[in-house]
Structures are given as C-alpha cells and as structure tokens.
C-alpha cells in the first residue's frame, strides 16, 4: 500500500503547475547579414580536421585536446555541474529509508521489560504543487548544459591558440633563417668594403654603414633565436606536454597556402548562434528563468508527507517471526506568513539576475558579430596586400641585383647596394608577417563562425 501511495504522490507532483516565466530567446541585436561575406545562405560547419590539413599540426591539436589543463578543468566542471543536477533532481522523488530500533525500559512495580520495533520503510516527500523543485531541477540542468558549452568553447579556443602558436613558430623560424642569411651577406659586404678602404677606394663612412647593417643583422639573429625558444615554450604549455621535434614546423614558406582552409562565411548572421559561447550564455539565461519560478513558489504553502510501515515486537528475538504490523502517516503544511522580506528579496534577486544575463547574452552576440566582421574585413584586403608585397619584394631584389652589377662594372658605389639590401630585408620581413596574418586570419574566421563541433564533444 505504501508503495502505491508513493507512486501516486510522484504522479501528482508531476502534474503540478510551473511558475517559471515564459521563456523566449532574446532577439539578436545585430544586422541580419554579415558585412563583406561571400556566397549564399548559411555557412557550413567545418570540423577542425577538415580545416587543418598539416598532419603534424593535426597531431599537435589532438595532443593538446587530451592534455591541456584548461580543457581538463572544463571537463571537471561538467562533471561537477552534472552531479549537482543529479542532486537537485533527487528532490523530485520520495526518500525511502530502512530503520531498526530497539528500546529498553524498567518498571519499579513489575520489573524490567524490553520492547523492540523495526520500521521496514520510512518515507518523506514534499509535494511539489507549485513547481519549486521542478524549477530548481530545470535551473540545475541548464547550468549543466551551459558547462558543456563552456568546455566546447575552451576546446575551440585552444585549437585556435595552438594553431596560431604553431604557425608563429614557423614564421619566427623563417625570420631567423632570413636574419642569418642577411648577417652572412652583410659580413661579406663588410669585408669587401674594409679591403677597399685599405687601398683607398672606399670611405670610412662606407665601412660604418656596412658595419651598421652587419650588427643589425647580428642582433636580429640573437633576438629571433630567443623568440623561437619562447615560441616552443608557449606551444608546450598549450599542448600540456613537451612536443617532439618532428611535430614542430619548419619555415613558414615551406607550408602550402591551403594548409589552412578558408571557411566560407555565408551571408546570414544566424550562423553565429551556433557558437558555443552564445549557447552557453543562453543556457545560463534559461537557468536564471527557472530560478525565478523557484523564487515565486516560495510564496506558497509547502506540503510535506512522512510515512512509515513495518513490523514491531515486544522482544527483539521474535521481531522477524511473529511481530505486529505497524504504520504511521504524518502530513504537514508550512505556510510562509512572515519571512522578513526574504522571499521577496529572493524573487527580486532572481529577476535582476535574469536581466543581467539577458544583457550578457546580447553582448555575447554582439561580440561574436564583431569578431566575424573584423575577420571578414581583414580578409577583403589581405589577398591584395599579399600580392602587392610579393611584387615589392621582387622589385627590391631587382634593385639589389642592379646595384651589384653597377658596382662590379665600376659605375656605382657599394653604399647603394647596402641600402638596397637593407630595404630588401625589411620587405621580406613584412611579407612573412603578411603570410602569417593570412594563416591566422583563416583560423580566426573559422573560430569566430563557431568552428566545427563534431570532434569537440
């Protein structure tokens, strides 16, 4: 009978009212279309393994996803939120305990007697007539789901950061190689001009200029050697372990342009809603909405039921053989008459929290739009800049070649050659910077559009 009663009570609570406010996703405070986007309709979700094509970088990303401490903490936060949801959800069901009790009493008139009693089940349950426990359960579930998207966003950010760090190392390897090449050339030029000065065909200012170029290149070599070591340290920190040398990149020029795919952005700003940070913000908002329902329910009576059933005997030895059946049922009603304004304060707090989270959601959407807009704006001029810079490097190389031929023919001075070589070096460095920007812009665009989720779960 007790079992049937408990089932009835659970079904009764399942049909209780909810005092949660009606929830609707806030309207996105952004334009309907992305500025500078190409193509039709919505962007296609690209898994990171479909965007990154270098097998070394793919392996580095996989290692990082398994070993990075930020990811591990995010996973632990998911487990914590899931456990809290399970704890909160348990309040929707009765608690049933088994109990064994024994009492001993002494009578001055009749001597000593012993009574033993065992309660087979003791159950307590709070009828959720106004949906308070249901609201708390929904709030905990939404918090758990928000933590899932927090972890996805952590993984997405990690992929972008470690890819950028890997490419930065490649760029600094290129800069180091270029600085060494420039230093060797400048050292050779310095020796030539020093010999010319000894025979009176070069001025002291020519030697000083050549020395300046050489020392500048020498300082750059030392600087880039330090930078390369720091790049490796940053990469190892993101990976969560020391990476093998065969997983590290060579120079940036050795990487094909399509090593990082260019993800089409589409034209609709609705694609931003799949970003994990936006989904996290919405689940937090849904949790706050359910908290309002729980706060509203505090104004209504609480009905608690306690029941027990079992057997009893006047001797412990005969308890389980021929004991008497016993039972009890104790309902109670608690009506909040005066709480010193606590319930009203809780409701106002929950409503204020929701307003704040609406603002957070809207700002997250706006920030996402800005991220994509900035990435697309950079993309529109990047190809033209790269082409112009490549032509500039070619022109500077031709200037160096012409200067050398004129010098070798005796109709030009070596100072002109040194000046041209310095300009060429600067142009080559700028080209490397633009090539790195091209790669990182592709990664940023993929990330800002929400990335690919299938391998991040």
Language-model segments: residues:
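Short segments within alpha-helical structural elements
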Residues: 187-188, 216-246, 295, 382, ...
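Alpha-helical heptad-repeat coiled-coil segments that mediate oligomerization/polymerization in large
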Residues: 200-203, 368, 375, 410-414
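Small/polar, glycine/serine/threonine/aspartate-rich low-complexity segments that form flexible
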Residues: 43-53, 99-122, 136, 245-264, ...
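Transmembrane beta-barrel architecture of outer-membrane proteins
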Residues: 57-59, 115-117, 164, 209, ...
């Amino acid at each position: 009978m007790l079992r049937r009663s408990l089932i009835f009570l659970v079904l009764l609570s399942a049909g209780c009212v909810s005092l949660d406010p009606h929830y609707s996703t806030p309207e996105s405070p952004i334009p309907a279309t992305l500025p500078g986007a190409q193509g039709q309709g919505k962007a296609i979700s690209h898994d990171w393994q479909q965007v990154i094509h270098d097998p070394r970088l793919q392996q580095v990303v996989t290692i990082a996803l398994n070993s990075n401490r930020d990811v591990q903490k995010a996973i632990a936060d998911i487990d914590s939120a899931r456990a809290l949801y399970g704890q909160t959800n348990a309040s929707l069901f009765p608690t049933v305990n088994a109990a064994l009790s024994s009492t001993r009493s002494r009578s001055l008139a009749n001597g000593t007697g012993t009574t033993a009693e065992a309660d087979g089940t003791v159950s307590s349950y709070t009828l959720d007539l106004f949906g308070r426990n249901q609201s708390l359960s929904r709030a905990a579930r939404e918090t758990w789901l928000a933590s899932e998207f927090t972890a996805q966003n952590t993984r997405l950010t990690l992929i972008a950061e470690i890819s950028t760090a890997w490419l930065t190392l490649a760029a600094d390897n290129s800069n180091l190689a270029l600085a060494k090449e420039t230093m060797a050339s400048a050292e050779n030029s310095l020796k030539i001009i020093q010999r010319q000065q000894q025979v009176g065909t070069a001025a002291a200012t020519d030697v000083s200029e050549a020395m300046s170029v050489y020392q500048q290149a020498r300082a750059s070599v030392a600087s880039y050697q330090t930078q390369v070591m720091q790049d490796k340290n940053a990469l190892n920190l993101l990976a969560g372990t020391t990476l093998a040398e065969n997983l590290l990149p060579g120079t940036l020029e050795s990487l094909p342009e399509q090593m990082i795919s260019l993800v089409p952005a589409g034209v609709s700003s609705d694609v931003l809603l799949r970003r994990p940070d936006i989904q996290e913000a919405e689940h937090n908002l849904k949790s706050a909405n359910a908290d309002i329902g729980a706060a509203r329910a505090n104004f209504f009576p609480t009905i608690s039921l306690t029941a027990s059933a079992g057997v009893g005997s006047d001797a412990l030895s005969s308890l389980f053989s021929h004991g008497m059946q016993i039972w009890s049922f104790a309902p109670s009603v608690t009506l909040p008459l005066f709480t010193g304004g606590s319930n009203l304060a809780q409701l106002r707090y929950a409503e204020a929290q929701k307003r704040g989270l609406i603002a957070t959601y809207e700002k997250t959407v706006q920030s996402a739009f800005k991220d994509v807009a900035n990435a697309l704006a950079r993309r529109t001029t990047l190809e033209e800049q790269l082409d112009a810079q490549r032509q500039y490097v070619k022109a500077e190389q031709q200037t160096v070649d012409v200067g050398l031929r004129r010098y070798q023919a005796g109709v030009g001075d070596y100072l002109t050659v040194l000046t041209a070589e310095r300009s060429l070096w600067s142009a080559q460095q700028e080209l490397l910077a633009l090539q790195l920007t091209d790669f990182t812009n592709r990664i940023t665009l993929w990330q800002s559009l929400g990335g690919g989720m299938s391998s991040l779960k």
